[in-house]
Regions:
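An anion/pyrophosphate-binding glycine-rich loop and adjacent beta-alpha core
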Residues: 200, 206-342, 398-399, 452-458
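Helix-loop-beta segment of a Rossmann-like dinucleotide-binding subdomain
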Residues: 43-47, 84-112, 181-185, 294-301, ...
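Core beta-strand elements of the Rossmann-like FAD/NAD(P) dinucleotide-binding domain
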Residues: 160-172, 412-416
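Conserved redox-cofactor binding core of oxidoreductases
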Residues: 65-156, 160-164, 176, 221-224
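Short beta-strand to alpha-helix junction loop
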Residues: 48-55, 97-116, 127, 187-195, ...
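Conserved N-terminal glycine-rich FAD pyrophosphate-binding loop of Rossmann-like flavoproteins
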Residues: 5-38, 42, 219, 229
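Glycine- and aromatic-enriched mobile tails/lids
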Residues: 6-8, 15-21, 63, 69-97, ...
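Glycine-rich loop(s) and the adjacent beta-strand/alpha-helix scaffold that form part
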Residues: 172-229, 236, 435-448, 452
Length: 603
């Protein structure tokens, strides 16, 4: 198991506050959960995937609790309640309370429980501070045979440190690299969220979809850090559960921000646009107006014992961070918030077994021996075979396009390559992710991908394929040179500085022209800018020679660039407003254009 940083703490999961969805309440059902998911996703989700996730989710959440995840129980708020009953929250877009949580630090608790299991497993080895840079394929490019990384020795590796090239031979690789929040200047994602998985997979010809659907969380904290601390670029998230508990969004005049039917609990895309509109109005009225709105959490505060202390009781992590920044809800302070890039609903396409899909020479094979499918199967049939436990060889599949009406009929699984979580596009989220469905998707597809990988591994072993030998014959990417070069530190520093400048320009470009509200003219400018920055990156790599390939800042910038290109192209091809994609030049009621923009093969 490889981690670019430190396993369990550096990924986005550890920062997830709200919770994980599971239809466990007596009044709830997987069907109701599926309905809410489809509604939030503007009905361009894959309904088969939605049903599978909502059906399988509750059992996996209960399994997490058996693993030792300490979820908050009803007894935490009611002395007469059972210790066995989960406390279920309501968040935006949900018609029922179904969010299982660990106070307001659910992701950290899930990471802790799973990491303990991983560390205690005799057959799992953790490799921290290993940044993936390229997938390894067999010489005939018929299957994945491993992964190339940059390894860093220091505990908190700096981008100025030259990485050591390391190759891991493996018949199966599962990408779980998270999203790409760093393509924007303000994000709730950690620094390592640079789109690695999408860039790695598309380099092999994987197809993407839904890339235009970038979710901006409506309520990132818009307060400066405490005195003496420098801004990090990662915005602190004020969980949606705060609004679910009764907090209200108000503008600088104290007027309600959200005026639609669902009010403050509308899906995130609508709330983010409502806040964007409120900030725009404030700025037009007065240039000195704040570039944020406020959360009034006094109703939450009053929900505590004796009518006070409710906010700190329910949201201790958020309360502690607010107090660090001089904001005290208990004394009536409002919480300044503004949208920040939070989640990518698109990614590399996968089937129901988490297999990455592509249209390249990486075919459905037995490590070099092509097995042609004798019949095309649907996803529902795949689910049926999974339920029966029948083992089968990989076959050609139909690929979802976030809607049952449009399939990419030429895509096939890339042998040995799997993906789960935010880097993938499973069809669950559609045009907008329902709150707290992200951890759930990771659970369901993480397990499904693992089960499929085990079958693939059995097939490889049955054929007697030596994956190590295949990986040994593959060339190193980017002209790696493991030998020390004269002046390499100075070269690396120059490459790093140039790459960081390109990253900053890319972030500004994306925020200006491909953010919450878009225009066709702006998207065209973004496309031109991305192309220009690509030329700059090629020049930087050429100037650094072999040393450049070992500079993490450059590799990450190239990943960011590849991801941004996918987002902009997808946004330009969508000629309607739907979910998270809102172009003011395409005003309408979202009745046309169900087809999702797909990537071209990147080689």
């Amino acid at each position: 198991m490889l981690s670019k940083g430190t396993a369990g703490s550096d990924g986005s999961t550890a920062y997830a506050q709200g919770g994980v969805c599971a239809a466990l309440a007596p009044t709830d059902s997987p069907q109701k959960h599926a309905h809410d998911t489809l509604l939030a996703g503007s009905h361009v989700n894959d309904p088969v995937v939605v049903d599978v996730v909502c059906q399988e989710g509750p059992e996996l959440v209960l399994e997490l609790a058996e693993f030792g995840a300490q979820f908050t129980r009803m007894s935490a708020y009611d002395d007469n309640a059972s210790d066995e009953q989960f406390h279920l929250c309501t968040e935006g877009g949900h018609s029922q309370p179904r969010v299982v949580h660990a106070q307001d630090a659910t992701g950290a608790e899930i990471s802790r429980a799973l990491l303990e299991r991983v560390k205690s497993h005799p057959n799992i080895t953790l490799h921290d501070r290993h940044a993936a840079v390229a997938l390894v394929t067999s010489p005939d490019r018929s299957a994945v045979a491993g992964i190339d990384c940059l390894a860093f020795d220091d505990d908190e590796h700096s981008t100025t440190t030259l990485g050591k090239p390391v190759r891991f031979a493996a018949p199966c690789v599962c990408l779980a690299t998270g999203g790409c929040g760093q393509i924007y200047p303000i994000t709730t994602n950690p620094a390592g969220s640079t789109g690695d998985g999408v860039a790695l997979a598309t380099a092999l010809g994987a197809v993407t979809d839904g890339m235009e659907f970038v979710q901006f969380h409506p309520t990132a904290l818009a307060a400066p850090p405490p005195p003496g601390e420098k801004p990090t670029g990662r915005a602190f998230l004020v969980s949606e559960a705060v609004r679910g508990a009764g907090a209200k969004l108000v503008d600088a005049n104290g007027d309600a921000v959200c005026r639609g039917g669902m009010g403050d609990l509308a899906p995130r895309d609508q709330v983010a646009r409502d806040i964007y509109a409120a900030i725009t109005r404030q700025m037009s009225d007065s240039p000195a107006a704040p570039q944020h709105v406020f959360l009034d959490a006094q109703a939450v505060e009053a929900s505590g014992p004796k009518g006070k202390g409710g906010f700190a009781l329910k949201f201790p992590t958020i309360d502690a961070e607010l107090r660090r920044r001089g904001i005290d809800v208990s004394r009536g302070d409002l919480i300044p918030v503004a949208p920040a890039c939070h989640y990518q609903c698109g990614g590399v396409c996968t089937d129901l077994d988490g297999r990455v899909l592509g249209t390249t020479s990486l075919r459905v094979t037995n490590m070099g021996r092509t097995r042609k499918s004798k019949q095309r199967r649907s996803r529902s049939r795949s689910a049926g075979r999974r339920a029966s436990g029948e083992e089968r060889a990989p076959e050609r599949v139909l690929v979802h396009a976030h809607g049952p009406s449009s399939h990419h009929r030429h895509a096939q699984p890339i042998a040995g390559l799997f993906a789960a979580g935010e880097c993938s596009s499973t069809g669950l989220h559609g045009a907008n992710r329902l709150a707290s469905n992200s951890l759930l998707e990771g659970l369901v597809f993480g397990k499904r991908a693992a089960d499929a990988a085990k079958l693939h591994l059995k097939m490889v072993r049955a054929e007697g394929v030596d994956v190590g030998e295949l990986a040994l014959d593959a060339p190193w990417p980017f002209g790696f040179d493991v030998e020390a070069c004269p002046g390499e530190v100075d070269v690396a520093k120059a490459v790093e500085e140039s790459a960081m400048q390109v990253t900053a320009e890319l972030q500004a470009l994306m925020m200006s022209h491909c953010g919450i509200v878009r225009t066709t003219r702006g998207l065209l400018r973004a496309a031109e800018g991305v192309q220009e920055l690509g030329i700059r990156l090629s020049e930087i790599r050429a100037s650094g020679g072999a040393v450049a390939s070992r500079v993490l800042a450059l590799v990450e910038c190239e990943f960011l660039h590849a991801y941004a290109r996918e987002v902009v192209n997808a946004a330009l091809h969508r000629r309607e407003n739907r979910g998270l994609h809102y172009n003011v030049d395409h005003c309408g009621d979202q009745t046309e254009g169900l087809e999702v923009a797909r990537s071209e093969v990147v080689s």
